[in-house]
Amino acid sequence: FNNTRSDILVQRNASVPLYTGLSLPRENIGETVNRGVDWSVNFSETSREFKYNLGFNLTYAQSEVIFRDEAANIPEWQKSTGKAVDSWVVYETNGIYRTQAEVDNSAHFSGAKPGDLWVKDTDKDGSITSNDRVRIPQSATPKIAYGIPMKAEYKRISIDLLWTGQSMAKQMILPQAQGSIVSPPTWLYNDRYTADNPNSKYPVAFNDTDPRNNIAADFWLRDASFFRLKSLEVSYVLPEKMLSRFGILNMRFYAGGTNLFSIDNMKQYNLDPETNNTTGVNYPQTRIYRVGVNISL
């Protein structure tokens, strides 16, 4: 597929400076394109007492900005034209400063010290500013999504499963983006930089006002791929001979659930790979267990 959207209603808030004081109307100027492919295959087989069905579907999709209003003076490496619609704009990093010598011998934010993020000087001007941010190809929207439906029946017993997954997506794990109402998580606190832990995984302790660590940086991006058991149901139908004496045509018992199992890298951060939850307002996937009986009279 190749789906082009044009005449998208947007304001010229980027190219018109704020100091004009203008409240701009929406114009039909935006344009994007989504390219990709959908593919599916299904196989089934039936015998006298056993039958099964196995399927696989996959979608690869890549969005691209054709035109978006952008400021004329932003660096080329920050422009969204030609990139994914929701591509990340981040500071690139070399990890964490471990020594004062590393701070002294590199461009850095004012007040930088060992334990802070080591931000790259992208424009090579000897200082770290907003111009050093880079728009990267990755986004929170996966380029690959797939599903594997499976069903099998043997006599009166059946099982129905749906596996889902995604790949080629990045999520921001920076918890302080949620503001001061959110306490730092234990994973960030326990492995933070200290004098006794100079080889820590994460920077020094910081809050939501920290200008050196509480920033959108590639250091905080993680692979949001997952493989999940989206739904499962096991059922059993009672024999008709047993039910006929009670005037019942059919009785089916079932048990199952949704969101039962997942393989992903986001559990350690208490985040859902399907939810880009940097603000804390998105509710994660709900796990549901259910049992019941269907009766036909």
Features from the language model and the residues they span:
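Membrane-embedded beta-strands that build the outer-membrane beta-barrel scaffold
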Residues: 1-2, 35-45, 52-60, 146-152, ...
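Outer-membrane beta-barrel and related beta-rich outer-membrane complex signature
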Residues: 8-13, 53, 60-79, 168-193, ...
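Flexible, solvent-exposed coil segments and beta strand-coil junctions
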Residues: 13-23, 123-131, 204-217, 267-275
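C-terminal beta-signal and terminal closure region of outer-membrane beta-barrel proteins
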Residues: 22, 26-34, 76-102, 191, ...
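Outer-membrane beta-barrel proteins
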Residues: 25-29, 44, 134-138, 219-224, ...
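C-terminal extracellular loops and terminal segments
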Residues: 26-29, 74-88, 136-147, 151, ...
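Conserved small-residue
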Residues: 27-33, 46-140, 265
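Extracytoplasmic gating/loop element in the C-terminal half of outer-membrane beta-barrel translocons
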Residues: 112, 166-252, 257
